[in-house]
Amino acid sequence: GGEAAREAGVTITGALDDATASMLGGVVLTDNSKDELIRRESFDTRVAVYVPDERAASASTNVERSKLVAPVVERAFDMARDGDYADAMTTNGFAYCAALRRDASPAVDALAHAEGAGLSGTGPSFAAIGDSGSIKEVAKDWKKLDGKVLTLETDNRGVSTNSGTR
């Protein structure tokens, strides 16, 4: 699973957080180093996602620079553990923008309307969360940028098979 993906160089973390969020829905907190799910809970919000035209592979991420922001990322994790998902997302996003030398402008611009915004994973995409009206405003601003903008609702149900069973 995660260890094999890390060894193959296709992921930095093992992607347990991504896999469990996709499978279970809602917000998940994981310890990727231990391949452990810590908590999963429902989270109802609207989401805007900005996908720039540029592409970036997570395997090309500067791991050493990412380690330098580990204390900030730990603080963001503590915020998430306390249920403060918007601030956790924003703090984590800015930390990784700095570590990965990515322009944080899309997140900064989104914060004019959204509750939280940040880099998605190692980028280059950004996500913002908030109520329907604020996410419409974020999407309007992001549509001025080169790339694609999606507006979505969080999925609290997780994956289901074609037959509808879970």
Locate predicted features.
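Gly/Ser-rich oxyanion-binding loop with an adjacent helix/lid
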Residues: 1-34
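A generic structural signal for well-ordered coil/turn residues at beta-strand boundaries
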Residues: 15-16, 23-24, 43-46, 122-123
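Short beta-strand segments
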Residues: 22-23, 49-53, 120, 153
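C-terminal domain-closing interface element
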Residues: 25-53
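Short, acidic Gly/Pro/Ser/Thr-rich loop/turn segments
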Residues: 36-37, 54-59, 135
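Acyltransferase
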Residues: 44-102, 108-112
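Glycine-rich, charge-dense phosphate/pyrophosphate-binding loop(s)
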Residues: 81-166
